[in-house]
Amino acid sequence: MGFRSKKKVIAAKTAAELDAMQAAGEIVGKALQAVRAEAKAGMSTWDLDQIAEQVIRDAGAVPTFLGYQGFPASVCASVNEVIVHGIPSKETILEEGDLVSIDCGATFDGWVGDSAWSFGIGELDEEVQGLNLATEWVLMEGMKAMVPGNRLTDVSHALEVATRKAESKFGVALGIVDGYGGHGIGRHMHEEPYLANEGNAGKGPVIQEGSALAIEPMLTLGTEDSAVLEDDWTVVTLDGSWASHWEHTVAATKGGPRILTPRY
């Protein structure tokens, strides 16, 4: 899969605009931390959604996901073989050993923060733990390419290279989910360009100082292929293998990549 934008550069934000984006991103970070702290077996994914929404609204922000293209909740809650876009539900009850991805967005003063992480309910199986640690590591390694002067697919390539290194580092075989990836972000959650999680380096628009991308590797213990369920949102692995999803909103600066969705 290739890059989808014909623009020669990725739009840049000013220093003040990046600060505004980080203010939104910090709210997202607090929401994610609150969800993880409260999550336990016997709770529903709807319960987790309510926790995140409360944190976002208490901070004076608005849940970006709620109502976005008709999405009915404030977070995406994706469990086990669900890769992304899981709809929180009172019927989805968490069990010990589940791997849960929470993807969350907040809009604050007109700017959007978008971030995700995956975590276990209780203790994870060794292979699943390896998958989750690997996906987090791939995110942190891949974002190192988010520097002025690089091109869009330099980030894609860095993510792919990190994924292959992670297989030996964490002792797991990993599938890179095809057809899903990161994106530009700012006043809107999804802006140009689309960011693939694999590919050749040196292509696509140039990253400028102040360019911002949501970088989000999605890895599985099996297939690269996925399917969308009848709800038109939930994306699952085609072979039932479990998936992990990690995401940060990241800006390119003179000092290197700047995470705009920190979790303090």
What is each stretch, according to the model?
Residues 1-264:
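Active-site neighborhoods and metal-handling regions in enzymes and metal-associated proteins
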